[in-house]
Amino acid sequence: MEVICISDNLETAIGLRFSGINTVVINNREEINNYLETIIKENKIGIVVVTKKIYELCKEKIEQIRNNSKLPLIVNIP
């Protein structure tokens, strides 16, 4: 299983890339929701790290995934 970070901040994404985590930078709610759906369908990602702003933009979708799926584990970072 892979780990990925969905970030709204380029600096956060770069820092996590240096630690070996794949990252994407997205700032649009619809794109984030679509990306989360893709992650669930592909079933390759075990952990999704999201920044605070991403969580706030897509709180309902993230909580739905947390409540209805064992994977991926979604972790918020500041």
Locations of regions flagged by a protein language model:
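Solvent-exposed alpha-helical segments within well-ordered globular domains of core cellular machineries
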Residues: I14, N33-T38, E56, E60-E63
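Short, surface-exposed connector motifs at secondary-structure boundaries
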Residues: F18, N43-I45
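Short secondary-structure boundary segments
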Residues: N28, T51-K53, P78
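Short, solvent-exposed amphipathic alpha-helical segments in soluble enzyme
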Residues: I21-N22, I40-K41, E63-N67
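N-terminal first-folded block
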Residues: M1-N27, N33
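C-terminal binding/interaction regions
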Residues: E37, I45, P78
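Periplasmic-binding protein-like
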Residues: G46-V50
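C-terminal structural segments of small proteins and small subunits
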Residues: K59-P78
